[in-house]
Each structure stands twice: as C-alpha cells, then as structure tokens.
C-alpha cells in the first residue's frame, strides 16, 4: 500500500500566445514602402491604392507616403497610401 498520496493531474494549464493583430500605422502617419499597416485575420480592412495584401491578409505599403482609411461601400473599410504631397 502506498504511504504517499499520489498527486492528481489537471486538464487546465495551457494558454496560447497573443497574435499581436491590429492597426500598426494609423491615418495620417507617414510610412515607407513595405511598412506593415494592418495585421489581421480575414479582410476586415481591404487594400486600396498603393497597398498590398500578404498571404496572411496583412496589409502593407507599396510606396512611401501617408496612410488614409476610407469607406468601401456599405460597412466596408479600405486602406490606401498616397504620396506625401497629395494625401487625400
């Protein structure tokens, strides 16, 4: 017979790391080409003028310029980058 009580186990004790999603550059901010503007899952924000979309739906600047957030139809949002002189 055991003289020590065996320790039980638990089914908890796990947690995942945060994914660090969200807007990284806000409207009016100056960005360099290749800068990440939004990290997202799915297309909450759609790419607009001079903005590319990566395989994980990350939006990034294709040119140096100023970030603008715009409406896209009803309820949609898009992100564009315009050259610093002609920001909309």
From Swiss-Prot:
UniProt-listed GO biological process terms: translation
Keyword Ribonucleoprotein: yes
GO cellular component, one term: cytosolic large ribosomal subunit
Region (Disordered): 1-23
Coiled coil: none
UniProt biased composition (Polar residues): 7-19
Matches recorded under SUPFAM superfamilies: Ribosomal L27 protein-like
HAMAP family: Ribosomal_bL27 (MF_00539)
Listed name of the protein: Large ribosomal subunit protein bL27
Species assigned in the record: Synechococcus elongatus (strain ATCC 33912 / PCC 7942 / FACHB-805) (Anacystis nidulans R2)
């Amino acid at each position: 017979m055991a003289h020590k009580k065996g320790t039980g186990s638990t089914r908890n004790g796990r947690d995942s790391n945060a994914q660090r999603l969200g807007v990284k550059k806000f409207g009016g901010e100056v960005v360099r080409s290749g800068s990440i503007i939004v990290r997202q899952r799915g297309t909450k924000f759609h790419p607009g003028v001079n903005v590319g979309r990566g395989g994980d739906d990350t939006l990034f600047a294709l040119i140096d310029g100023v970030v603008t957030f715009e409406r896209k139809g009803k309820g949609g949002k898009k992100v564009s980058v315009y050259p610093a002189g002609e920001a909309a």
